[in-house]
A protein has these predicted regions:
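Short capping segments at the starts of secondary-structure elements
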Residues: 11, 23-27
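Beta-hairpin "wing" of winged helix-turn-helix
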Residues: 30, 50-60, 67
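A short acidic, leucine-rich amphipathic alpha-helix
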Residues: 16, 30-32
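Short helix-coil-helix linker/hinge
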Residues: 6-12, 69-71
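Hydrophobic residues on short alpha-helical segments
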Residues: 17-21, 49
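Amphipathic alpha-helical dimerization/coiled-coil segments
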Residues: 1, 21-22, 67-88
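Helix-turn-helix DNA-binding motif, specifically the short coil turn and the N-cap/start of the second
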Residues: 38-41
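Residues within the alpha-helical elements of helix-turn-helix
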Residues: 19, 34, 58
Length: 88
């Protein structure tokens, strides 16, 4: 659990996870546009999220599609709920 939480401690990774929560399954190009980051940087962050078990990937032709795992959904929801309580 701690390693998964550390993976979302990075602001870019948190933004990517939130985008996947909103958009469902997205490709690197879509995530790079949302995060306003370079494709290679987004790919690096997605690898970290995948290693932590927070996202899955699948190949669709030349593109790789990413989605949150159930664990990723749960952890992100917990973090966002905690943040909302702190700012309320």
């Amino acid at each position: 659990m701690a390693s998964r939480a550390r993976a979302l401690a990075d602001p870019t990774r948190l933004m990517l996870a939130a985008a996947l929560r909103e958009g469902g399954e997205l490709c690197v190009c879509d995530l790079a546009w949302v995060a306003e980051r370079a494709h290679n940087l987004v790919s690096h962050h997605l690898r970290s999220l995948r290693s932590a078990g927070l996202v899955t990937s699948r190949r669709d032709g030349k593109m790789v599609m990413y989605a949150l795992t159930d664990q990723g959904e749960h952890l992100l929801a917990s973090l966002l709920d905690a943040r909302a309580r702190l700012t309320a």
